[in-house]
Amino acid sequence: MPSTPSKTLETFPNPKPGRDFHIHMEVPEFTCLCPKTGQPDFATLVLDYIPNQACVELKSLKLYMWSFRDEGHFHEDVTNRILDDLVAATDPRYMRLTAKFYVRGGIFTNVVAEHRKDGWQPAPRVDLTQFEHQSNTRG
């Protein structure tokens, strides 16, 4: 597997496709460029999903996230683009991407984008676990 930025997301078979289970990931070092100023934007991305038949492979996810480092994107655009790419690669039952951008001009921006597979309904009372953030960048 390469160790340079890549737009390719690799997957592996869900080990328990008959069960809904929650996968939680944090990407505390996401960077892209502001399309207006060219200055770097930094964010912590929080990915929560319930896989269907495939799970995203972690190293490919890291290299995919790294591929945005030199690209200009508005916060709302990049969050939705990443979600769309992850959904296209994994076809999850449910996926939520939360992007917590660091302060810019005195304003923190959080963008939350969600996908729900057509026809999928969670079992009654599915509460997604709240994980303590491991990043020291923002609470």
Curated annotation (Swiss-Prot):
A GO cellular component entry from the record: cytoplasm
Record has Cytoplasm as a keyword: yes
Main location (coarse class): cytoplasm
Source superkingdom: Bacteria
UniProt key word Transit peptide: no
Gene3D superfamilies: 3.30.1130.10
Transmembrane portions of the chain: none
Subcellular location: Cytoplasm
Any Pfam family matching the protein: QueF
Biological process terms in GO annotation: queuosine biosynthetic process; tRNA modification
Enzyme class at the top of the EC tree: oxidoreductase
Binding site for substrate: V56, E57, L58, H75, E76
One function term, GO molecular function aspect: preQ1 synthase activity
InterPro entries named among the record's database cross-references: GTP-CH-I_C/QueF, NADPH_dep_7-cyano-7-deazaG_red, QueF, QueF_type1
Catalytic residue list: C34, D41
Reactions catalysed, as given in the entry: 7-aminomethyl-7-carbaguanine + 2 NADP(+) = 7-cyano-7-deazaguanine + 2 NADPH + 3 H(+)
Pathway: tRNA modification; tRNA-queuosine biosynthesis
Keywords: Cytoplasm, NADP, Oxidoreductase, Queuosine biosynthesis
E.C. numbers: 1.7.1.13
Record's function text: Catalyzes the NADPH-dependent reduction of 7-cyano-7-deazaguanine (preQ0) to 7-aminomethyl-7-deazaguanine (preQ1).
HAMAP family: QueF_type1
NCBIfam families noted in UniProt: QueF-II (TIGR03139)
Family membership noted in the UniProt record: Belongs to the GTP cyclohydrolase I family. QueF type 1 subfamily.
Entry protein name: NADPH-dependent 7-cyano-7-deazaguanine reductase
